[in-house]
């Protein structure tokens, strides 16, 4: 997949999780921070997730934002929702994403909500299955969004007109 030029996008950042990790060494414990960040342009339907690790939180956040900008994806949005139901998996985390009627809102837990709102999806139903680890849930959501296809995409792949898809 081609890299997205993030300089032309109006990206908003959201810190999803800050995790203190330690390494036990001869002289005691070395503490560092692992941060997961979601960036997105809700107007254009772009979203990305990144992780950063550093001795200080601000450095870890900066690294995570840089990483997220390198991993942007375009999300297919139909009206205010997603084109079809999908399950995203990452590690032990599974996230079910279902399209919803207009006016439903984003029915999702914290980490999943951050990704969907950053992508510009306004109406969707979700269910977290498996791991409740914030980082795994965020990456599972991204995997689900990567699997989405519009009717036009499916018709093009099959080499048939869109009208023939629904017969």
Swiss-Prot record:
Source species: Thermoanaerobacter pseudethanolicus (strain ATCC 33223 / 39E)
Matching InterPro entries: Ribosomal_Su5_D2-typ_SF, Ribosomal_uS5, Ribosomal_uS5_bac-type, Ribosomal_uS5_C, Ribosomal_uS5_N, Ribosomal_uS5_N_CS, Ribsml_uS5_D2-typ_fold_subgr
Domain comment as written in the entry: The N-terminal domain interacts with the head of the 30S subunit; the C-terminal domain interacts with the body and contacts protein S4. The interaction surface between S4 and S5 is involved in control of translational fidelity.
Any single Gene Ontology cellular-component annotation: small ribosomal subunit
Presence of keyword ATP-binding: no
Name this polypeptide is given: Small ribosomal subunit protein uS5
Family of the protein in this entry: Belongs to the universal ribosomal protein uS5 family.
Gene3D superfamilies xrefs: 3.30.160.20, 3.30.230.10
